[in-house]
Structure formats: structure tokens, C-alpha cells
Amino acid sequence: MMKNHRRERVVRDRTKNMRKLPLLLLVFLPLAASAQAPSAPAASGPPPAISIKTAGMKHLAGLLPLDWDAQAGKLYLEIQHLGPDGKSPDLLYTNSLPYGTGSNDLGLDRGQVSDGRIVRFERSGPKILLVQRNMAFRSSSADPAERLAVTQSFPESVLWGFTVAAESPDGAVLIDATDFFLHDAHGVSDTLANLKQGAYKIDASRSAIALDDTKAFPKNTEVEAELTFTTDAPTPGNFVHDVTPDAHAMTLRERTSFIELPPPSFTPRRFVPRAGYFPSSYRDYTTPLGDPLDQLFILRHRLIKKDPNCVNACEAVAPIQYYVDRGAPEPIRSALLEGARWWDQAFQAAGWAKGTFRVDILPAGADPMDVRYNIIQWVHRYTRGWSYGEAVADPRTGEIIKGNVTLGSLRGRQDYMIAEALTAPYMDASAGQPHEEGHHPGEDPALQMVLARIRQLAAHETGHTLGLAHNFAASSVSQSDSVMDYPHPNIVLDANGHIDLSHAYTVNIGAWDKVAIDYGYREFPQHTSADAEQVALSNILSNADGAGQVFITDEDARPFGSAHPHAHLWDNGPDPAAELDRVLAVRTAALNNFGEAAIRPGTPMAQLEQMLVPLYLFHRYQTEATIKEIGGLDYRYNLRGDGLPDPSIVDPAEQRKALTAVLKTLAPQTLTLPESILALLPPVPPGYPRTRESFPSHTGLTFDPIAAAESAADLTLTVLLDPARASRLIEYHMRVPASPSLRGVLEAVSSTVAERPEAGHSMSSEVERAVEFRAVEAMLALAVNPAASSQARAIVRWHINDILRQLTTTPAPQDTAEAIHRAALIDRINEFERAPEKFVPAPPVEAPPGMPIGDDEDF
């Protein structure tokens, strides 16, 4: 605001001074003319013809032809189809990262693509503007005046300005696009700044067009640039430092793509919340009053039947073709192919012929970033991270132009480590344990579990690129099995009580996946009316509802305070409490078997701690799933008249059963590690530093079993005592008195963590003292959390007063450690009571990550 105001003042000052110029010009003009007389004035004239300007340049013919001036290092772009109004046809514009950072924390992965944007080139005299159209606000009216009114009501965005360098008599123009192709279109600098990695900017002297990967095709033009981002900061951010040879200069490649828009025969399909798709939306200001302003359609690929009247086993004019990255090694490559190919089952169930959905290895020499290829890429990173599926889509219709799957290679290594921790397969080498000699891949249970996971992961992320959203109810509703859930490995105990990995992950596409593809991709016979088609689509979902299938997605599953009893990440089974008991039994069996046989001979013994992390916390996500029964509400994405059930409070008996199971995760028997494990864990040796994947420690270099227990307890307490859950417990107890009350939950937690085995003088008692302190801290935090209702905060404060009263009135404990612990609790509560408004709760003890590292919001 201030900058614009100053600029206006400068313009006015210049205008004012211009009034004084004529006299000065009369005085100095003859002198100037005399001084310039020996040289002829430079004629601006019209720009040269394109053929003359580009003579000797390397020409790349395509949608937007390119001309490379190797001597000057300039790349020219030809615009051949400017209309009488000076505007080109609309194009789809995207950018991407062919070369990434390899950092989950930075989130700038190899193969990452941007959203598609509708752009056009506009000429105004010697200028060419690249204009992004505003597709968020539209008019479907046939009246040009109505459409113009909407267009003029909202801004467009001029992304770049060029100067005409040459033109031809047919109206084609040539522009120097070098600076455009060398700018940071992907927003790398902004990303680094937002992540506090430093102020990076492009160094033009260290950036250039990457001509080897710059191409022009009839339907798309691809320009790649090697960009070097530099910073003057003395200590660049750690994330950049982790992955870059010199953190002061990070060199990446960015790709700019101009793509011909698809033909207009694609029919958008309406978005319905319970159909399981991502929406593409815009506002239509021509809709009648009373009708929705926001128009929502699903994202999906184009499929056209060869026979318009075919009903079943219909052949497609152009099947949906995906390719797997040639950089994926075997046996990973075969697993990716197999898992992604599962989707053909769903397309067959939706009336298409076998082979309508195809997956093959990317042809040798093919460019995975080319928009013509739907790609499944194998990406390496510094730490394990998320895999994800993205799509470049036509903003006008929601048609998917390019599916782009990114699969992180370290996921498989993490799963292999989990399998090793569960089974401890490396017996004494002198005993001739065959695994040490190298199992055949088909005989290695850990490898088979990993490959099963990779098949499922390939199917899951490919599903996103077909337009499908997560269905986080699938794993807990038996009729709704789906690859679009996050599966926890279904580890079981065999008849002898040994760990069995053979059923860890499901095979093939699920029942819900077939429903979703049926809704999104079934094509009806020619001449089917729009109303009849809508009825048929509604019937697909109604039949799924009747079969007991449920769709619940991210917004209702990810928050710690979410209420849905079936929507969870990394869980299994229709009965969360029973499954938690089963998972705890598997965990106990694996811990009893855990020891040096979990690592190969020659591995530092300290690596056992890394193996122990996923095993000790094996129950963490099933615990979350079980907690969501408590203060839970069962609901669907209802539409009026669809016949779905109304929301209902979870049965009180189920809530109490869940609470009983959850409290076991706070019990000393669960959280105390045996001496047989503690005696094996040395500090880390040189070359093997502790990382974020290690347990927290209050004991310096040594393994800290107390901190490990605190971190596990806080995982439970954070979800159980979430402010939204606490507030719902009050409401639901008033509506259904048999439901657990907030006060009852608090009392149950306090009773559990007050348990002291062996009269308080034992390792398990020390663990539980730490857990009790964490529980009180969690309650104090809830008591001052403004997100909780006032009554919830009041009830928690009342309970804290009860704790204080009990601590100060019961006889002093005989055990010295217990007496000291009690005094510390009293001091902490008194600190809170003296000034609740100033009280700062201690943060939870952070457990090592269980999910892949990085931001999970988009995955």
C-alpha cells in the first residue's frame, strides 16, 4: 500500500517537472542535433521475420515451436495462432520437478507436479502477455453479456510479459522466453523460506536451459531448466544441508509444460460426498436463485466406448495406460506392476473389457515427465517419507490429463525392519541359521511382507491418480475393504504362539474400490438421458449402502479429536477394543522373543534400539482407533432423501469396553521393558548417531526406558484427553446417561496410573510414576486449553483438586521414591492452582515418528 502510494507521488512529481521541459528543450535541442549529426538515427522499425531471426538456430517443432540460440544461450518460443483479437487458443500450463531435493522435510520430490492452469498468450503492440484465466468464477449462460459480466467481476493473472522478437506475415510471433523458463515457477525459494532454511534466490550465472530434456511435440512443449538457488546465510538450514553437497548452492531442475487442451467431448460427472472422489469446483453465477452456486465435479480420466451402446465388457477407444519407472529395481518393479494392475478388476466390474486399465514398464528413453505418460515413479529420499498420487487435471472439467504417482523407496526398508523386529530371525550363525546364508526371495517372510505392502501401496497411490480419496472406514468395516485405506500390518500368532507375517496385507482391489470406480467410470449407453444417468449413479451408491459399505475420509479421521468410530489410520478390524487386545498380545509375544537375533551378526548392538522403536510402539495406532469409540459419533455423509441412517452416539457399552482396553496401554505391565532387553542396549557407537527415529532420552547417551514409556503414554493421553473429545463426553453423557462421563474417564486414568507393583520399589513402579506425572500434565493442559468447553475445563480442574486432596490427606508412603514423587505432584498442582491463567503445561514427550516422515496433509 505504501509502495504504491509513493509511486503515484513520483509520477505526479515527474509530470509537474515536465511542464518546465519545453524551454530547456529549445535551448539544448540544436546542440543535441549537432552532436548526433555524424550518425544516422537508429530505426526501430518492425521486428524481423522469424525465419531471418532464427537462421542458424536449432529448431524444435511442436505445439509451441522452440528455437535455441546456442551462441547467446537464449531459447525462443514461437506462438503461431494468435487470433484477430490478439489472443492465442487456451493452453494447459504446468510446472514440475524432474530433479528433486530428496528431503521429506522440504517436500520437493523428484517428479512432483503442479496443478494445471488455463493460460493464453495475448498481444498488445510489441508486448506478449502470458495470462492465466480465472476458472474459479464462471457463467454457463448462453448470453455473452452475462458471461462478460462474470469475467469482468474477478481478476485474471498476468504471469509474464515478453517482447516480440520477430514475426511472420501469417501472424506468428517469436518471443525470447529465456528468462521465463529460468524463473522459479515451482516456488522452491518460497518453500525454503517458509521452512526457515534460508533466503535462497536463483543465481542466473549458475543456471541454464537444460537442452537435453527440452522437447516439443504436437500436443505439448516441454522446457527444462537447471536452476541454482543460492544463499548468503552463514549457516543454511539443516534440511538443505542434509541433502546438498554445498548447502549454499542447491541445484535442481524445473520443467515448464504447455499442453494442448483435450477436445470438448468429455462429460464432467457430479461430485457426491459419499462416492469417494476428490472434487473439482467452481462458482457458476448463472445458476437459478435457490440452486447451488458452487458446482462440484469429480476428478477422473476420459474413457470412451468403441461401441456407444455397449453395456458390459465394453472396449475403450483408448485404454487408461500407466507406466512404472524403469529406475525401480526387482523385485520391487514386479510388485509395483502387479499392485497397480489390480485396478483393472474394478474397471471390469464397472462394465469395461479386460485390459481397459493397463500398467507396463516405461519404454526405454521415454521421458517420465512427459504429460503423455501416466507414471509410477520410484523416488529416493534422505529419510523415509510419504508416497502420494497427484494428477494434472483440466480445471474446466476435472478431466485427469496425467496421473503422477510418487513412491518413496525407504518405505520398504522400514517395513523390512519392522518384520525383523517382530520375528528376530537372525539366530546364532554357528547354529547354521539359513537366513544368514541368504534366503531365496520366495522363502524370506520379511521380504514377502514388504512386497505385499508395496503391491498395496502401488494400488493405493494409483487410486489417487484415478481421482479417488482415502476411505479410512474400510479397514474397520468388513464390507468396505479397500486399498484406499492406510493398512496396518495384520500380524497374527500361529498355533504355537509364533509371529506369522503371511497375512500382513490384503491382495487385490477391494469391494469399496469397485463401487467407487463404478460411480466414476461407468459409461451409459448412448442416448441415456441425464436424469436416467443420475438415477443409475445414485443406485450404485444406494446398493453399496444397502450392502453395509461405508465411506469416511480424511477430515473425519485425521484429527486427534475426531469422533467417527470407524474412521482411523493404520488400524484393523470391526471391533477396535478387541483388536487392541489382540495387537497387545502380538506385541507381548514379539517383545518376549526380542533380542540380538533381531539384527544380523556384525551389526552394532546399539541398532537394537532402532529395531525396538516400532515394536515397543506397535499398538500406537490401534490405540487411537479404540479411543475414538470414546465420545464417538457414528455418522455418514447424508443427503436428504438418500435413506442413510441419522448420526448416533456410540453404544455406551462399546465406549466402556474401549476405555478398558485403552487403559491397558497406560499400565506398568505394558510399558515396562524386561531386564533381558535393557541389558542388551549400549549407547550408540561412532558413526551411528541418534536420530529422530530414536527414543527420547533423559539419560544422555544411554537408552532411557522411562522416557520411552513416557512417550508411549503421551501417545494415548494426547488422543484420550483431546479437548474436542472431552467436550463431547459431557454432551453425550447428558443425552445418553449410560455413556461415559468426562469425570469418569479422568478417574479411570488416575486410578490406572496410580498402580504400583511390588509396593512401589521396582522398575515398573518407576515407569508408572513417570506415567502418572505425564497423566497429570495432560490433565493440567486440558484444564487451560481454550479449545475445550468451559464445562470441560471446570470438570478437569475439579478432578485435579480431587487428586491434590488425595495426595495431601492419605498417609505418607513408606517408599522414599514414592514419597518424593508425591511431593513433586503436589508442587506441580499447587503451581497450577496459584495462577491457572499463567500456567504453562509441559509438552508431551515426543515419540519417534510412526507414520512416514514429512507433511501428510496432501497424501
Residue ranges, per PLM feature:
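Positively charged n-region of N-terminal signal peptides that target proteins for export
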Residues: 2-3, 16-21
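Acidic, Ala/Val/Gly-enriched low-complexity intrinsically disordered segments
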Residues: 8-13
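Bacterial N-terminal signal peptides
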Residues: 22-32
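Auxiliary tRNA-acceptor-end handling modules of aminoacyl-tRNA synthetases
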Residues: 37-328, 346, 353, 361-415, ...
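Soluble non-cytosolic domains of exported or imported proteins
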Residues: 112, 326, 330-338, 370, ...
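Sec-exported extracytoplasmic/periplasmic mature domains
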Residues: 341-352, 463-464, 468, 489, ...
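The catalytic-center signature of Zn2+-dependent metalloproteases
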Residues: 360-380, 452-508
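Conserved catalytic/binding loops enriched for acidic/polar residues
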Residues: 475-859
